[in-house]
């Protein structure tokens, strides 16, 4: 008698001590004044620092039409040049009304598709309630240490420095030793731009 073989698949699951617990969120002003998309960092995605856990990587997308078809994408052409990316050199807006707690600048520019090395250019911005935001991978800062900024104020331009493979802005937040999930205030979200390609 033949027995049916059932393949056994084993999955390695990383157990996180707070998995299942509700993650506190913080409301932030959108980081761009045009339509954009973000990818999120999970609880186990980084152990570098509190500004990385639950952080998000945001980039500008455009509605692209080619030969009667349309979709959203973050770059034109091959994407091999920083200038191909729609986020490149866009204005970066402050996520909060806060004070500039720290500024670090990395002038080394990455090429898309090639990971750079730490550190990236970073702002640390502190709200009155103690929430600290990290805004990372920018260039051409417009504010300095100790400046007071308001939510939505232009603070820099999008760059591509540090541990980054393409032009984008990373935003992270924490209060004390607790990382926070970021939610952008949708009252200020702008529509996506459109472009036509040949």
Residue ranges and their predicted role:
Residues 8-18:
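Hydrophobic h-region of N-terminal signal peptides that target proteins for export
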Residues 86, 93, 131-152:
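Short histidine-centered loop motifs in beta-beta connectors
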Residues 98, 147-162:
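Active-site-proximal beta-strands of protease catalytic cores
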Residues 112, 158-170:
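Active-site loop architecture of trypsin-fold serine endopeptidases
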């Amino acid at each position: 008698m033949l027995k049916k073989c059932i393949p056994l698949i084993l999955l390695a699951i990383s157990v996180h001590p707070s998995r299942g617990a509700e993650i506190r969120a913080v409301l932030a002003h959108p980081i761009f004044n045009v339509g954009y998309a973000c990818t999120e960092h999970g609880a186990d995605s980084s152990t570098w620092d509190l500004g990385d856990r639950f952080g998000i990587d945001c980039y500008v997308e455009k509605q692209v039409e080619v030969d009667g078809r349309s979709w959203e994408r973050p770059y034109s052409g091959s994407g091999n040049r920083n200038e191909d990316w729609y986020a490149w050199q866009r204005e970066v807006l402050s996520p909060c009304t806060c004070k500039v707690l720290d500024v670090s600048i990395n002038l080394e520019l990455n090429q898309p598709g090639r990971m750079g090395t730490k550190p990236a250019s970073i702002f640390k911005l502190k709200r009155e309630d103690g929430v600290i935001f990290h805004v990372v991978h920018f260039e051409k800062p417009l504010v300095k240490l100790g400046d007071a900024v308001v939510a939505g104020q232009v603070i820099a331009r999008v760059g591509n420095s540090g541990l980054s493979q393409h032009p984008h802005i990373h935003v992270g937040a924490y209060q004390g030793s607790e990382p926070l999930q970021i939610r952008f205030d949708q009252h200020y979200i702008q529509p996506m731009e459109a472009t036509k390609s040949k």
